[in-house]
Amino acid sequence: MSKNYHIAVLPGDGIGPEVMTQALKVLDAVRNRFAMRITTSHYDVGGAAIDNHGQPLPPATVEGCEQADAVLFGSVGGPKWEHLPPDQQPERGALLPLRKHFKLFSNLRPAKLYQGLEAFCPLRADIAANGFDILCVRELTGGIYFGQPKGREGSGQYEKAFDTEVYHRFEIERIARIAFESARKRRHKVTSIDKANVLQSSILWREIVNEIATEYPDVELAHMYIDNATMQLIKDPSQFDVLLCSNLFGDILSDECAMITGSMGMLPSASLNEQGFGLYEPAGGSAPDITGKNIANPIAQILSLALLLRYSLDADDAACAIERAINRALEEGIRTGDLARGAAAVSTDEMGDIIARYVAEGV
């Protein structure tokens, strides 16, 4: 008998509920085709939770997530709540506390240039023609954003500010293993990003990544300095499979990877802890300007579901089925408005229906 799984669904604000509806259509198709026993429960988060419960992350939402195998997250935020104190606004008051509560130390951001969408890539046509499929693995809880001491002191010409880059062995080991395990499900290559010619933290990073690599003889490892990596991503992104990055370097490179795909509406992300529990969400925002118009691109939310199936439920076949269905739809020229460029566009609902049907049919 197949295992029972439970997903906490947090649609959130803006286009979140609209695109989440499409992801759940696809989940229904997955359940039926693969005979998976998956249940869902919905919870308020972000602005919707502020309106209904007076806070962006109600205790009931946290409890619901604790009882789930994974969290499928929509998007939060909007002009309606911008007047609130920063720590009570939807983004800082919901998403960041969730990451902290569940000790989500790794962030996975796929960036793929889909066939037929080369015209949206800002790179030269000959570079875009080669395509690319990159997974950026970023460490989330260490590094210069959290290292101590940090602060400001002094005055006049002696006023100064300082931050500290700190990484512990265990932090590097666990994020490296995420990268190597991910590479085993892809094209078996990890490129570790550092600045080991200057930074002591990067020297330790490189040493430990080399140690972990011995556990994965089937995965090729390369090292690259961050400054060179930013250039190589523009020159030839097809050379990369998995990028392994510290918090700061991953913050930079994941956004660069996102930009060269040409559409934020296509980009999912996953944040994982050591137990495989994850929070899965689109990389884009709540897009209040198009909310309720049935024109939002739901693919990033649907791909976030695929990541959830792959990493938290260990259902790679189901994840691949979703990805194939999306590829098929795009190859057939099916586009939402953000990708149509004057051609006929389908609605949010129609795109969800098409992808769900293709999953069910096993295209």
UniProtKB/Swiss-Prot annotation:
InterPro entries in alphabetical order: IsoCit/isopropylmalate_DH_CS, IsoPropMal-DH-like_dom, Isopropylmalate_DH
Family of the protein in this entry: Belongs to the isocitrate and isopropylmalate dehydrogenases family. LeuB type 1 subfamily.
**Biochemical pathway:** Amino-acid biosynthesis; L-leucine biosynthesis; L-leucine from 3-methyl-2-oxobutanoate: step 3/4
Give the top-level enzyme category: oxidoreductase
Q: How does it assemble?
A: Homodimer.
Q: Which UniProt keywords apply?
A: Amino-acid biosynthesis, Branched-chain amino acid biosynthesis, Cytoplasm, Leucine biosynthesis, Magnesium, Manganese, Metal-binding, NAD, Oxidoreductase
Keyword NAD applies: yes
Reaction(s) catalysed by this chain's protein? (2R,3S)-3-isopropylmalate + NAD(+) = 4-methyl-2-oxopentanoate + CO2 + NADH
Name the coenzymes or cofactors required.
Mg(2+); Mn(2+)
Its EC number(s)? 1.1.1.85
The family database entries (Gene3D superfamilies) matched by this protein are listed as:
Isopropylmalate Dehydrogenase
Matching entries from Pfam families are given as:
Iso_dh
From which domain of life does this come?
Bacteria
* The keyword Translocase appears for this protein: no
Tell me the GO molecular function terms. Answer: 3-isopropylmalate dehydrogenase activity; magnesium ion binding; NAD binding
Q: Which SMART domains match?
A: Iso_dh
Q: Where is this site: Important for catalysis?
A: 145, 195
Compartmental location:
Cytoplasm
Which positions in this protein are listed as binding NAD(+)? 78-91, 285-297
Q: Give the protein name, as stated in the record.
A: 3-isopropylmalate dehydrogenase
Q: How is the cofactor bound?
A: Binds 1 Mg(2+) or Mn(2+) ion per subunit.
What residues does substrate bind to?
Answer: 99, 109, 138, 227
Protein role? Catalyzes the oxidation of 3-carboxy-2-hydroxy-4-methylpentanoate (3-isopropylmalate) to 3-carboxy-4-methyl-2-oxopentanoate. The product decarboxylates to 4-methyl-2 oxopentanoate.
Task: Please name the SUPFAM superfamilies in this protein's record.
Answer: Isocitrate/Isopropylmalate dehydrogenase-like (SSF53659)
Tell me the GO BP annotations in alphabetical order.
L-leucine biosynthetic process
